[in-house]
Every structure is written in structure tokens, then in C-alpha cells.
Amino acid sequence: SINAFVEEMKDKPRMEAYKVLRNWIWYTTALHEMGHTMGLRHNFRGSADQRNFSPEYWDVYNAYWDKVEALRDEYQSKIDAGDANAYQAYVEAVDTIPSTHNRYGSTSIMDYMGDWVKWQYPVGSWDRAAILLAYGNKVEVKNDESGEYTLEQYQTGDFSQEDNYDADEVAASGRKVKYYMFCSDEKVFDDAFCTRFDVGATATEITRNFIRDA
């Protein structure tokens, strides 16, 4: 939120705050448009593809929910007793917790993020995977027990022919293809998670943030 940014930058030099804003607003916009020139479409499901978010997201996300849980423990007994004032105080206290994890809350620069601060690492995992497939003819597969994904080349074939990649063959080899969520303009409003300018990876988070920003 803008309040979180103001709090974060209040003791910083003016030029440092300017550089951060410049990067968030102009740099991310330039990357988005560059994605279009390279053939990428909008991906409005990037903000719902939580399993493919960057590691930075999870560090900040878990810290955020630790603070929410601490507030819940503080107010829960009064709320259970029917104290409406306690519930309102709890809601207001939660709203003061900086939700900086939303900066990392999408797998794609081609998403339309609702939070003005966007994210600090704008080229997401879906963007990289799409470019590697389109220009390098590569997909990510899981081929060991570590949980890490590596790049494996498509089987050699004529690029002008029908896709000859066979997921069954990969499965038979003991490897697993890494999948990403994708949804573009024609599906907006058909899918609750294919939405422009939403913030959050779950229905609860998205709804709460829409209400907060109303």
C-alpha cells in the first residue's frame, strides 16, 4: 500500500525514494510492453499462481501472517465474547500491517497488478518460462528429489510442425513438467481468478483488498 511505502521511505534521501518509484512505475511498464513485442500476452492468473511465486514472496508472506496471528491471539477472546469494538479494533490493526509481500505477488510482468507498488522483481517465473519455450524450445522439468526444476530441451523437430513434445514420455522417464497458470483477456470475468488489478492469491485476500481499496 502507499502507506507502507511512505513508512519505508520516510527516513531515506529524496533521491533514493525517487529511484525506487522510477523503477516501480517506469521500469516495470517498459518490461510489460517489451513482453508484448516479444509475443507475450497478458496473464491475469499470474497473481493466483502462488506455487510459482518467487522465494522472496514466501519470506515476507510468512512474516505478515505471523503478525496477523499475533493480533488474532490478542483480540480473539473479546471477539468470541461478542465485543464488536474489539473486532473493529482487530480489523483496523491488521490494516496497519504492511502487506509488502504483494510486491512479489505474481508470476508475470504481463499481469495487471492492483497494488500500486507492484513487485520488486518484475520479470516473473512465467515470463521466463514462456520466453524459454518460445525462443529456446525448452521447458522446465523436475528430474530429481530435490524439488528443484531444471531446463530440458524439446525433442528435436521441425519448428514449423505441430508441437512434438510428449508429456507421457517425460512422465515415463521419472521427470515431471512444471506447470504455470495462464489466463488472458478473453477469459476475464469468466474466472474469478482471471481479473485485472486484483491483489492476492486467494479469494479471501482478493476480496479483502478490493474492500480495503474501495
What does each model-identified segment do?
Residues 1-17, 21, 46-214:
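Conserved catalytic/binding loops enriched for acidic/polar residues
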Residues 28-43:
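Active-site recognition of the HExxH zinc-binding catalytic motif
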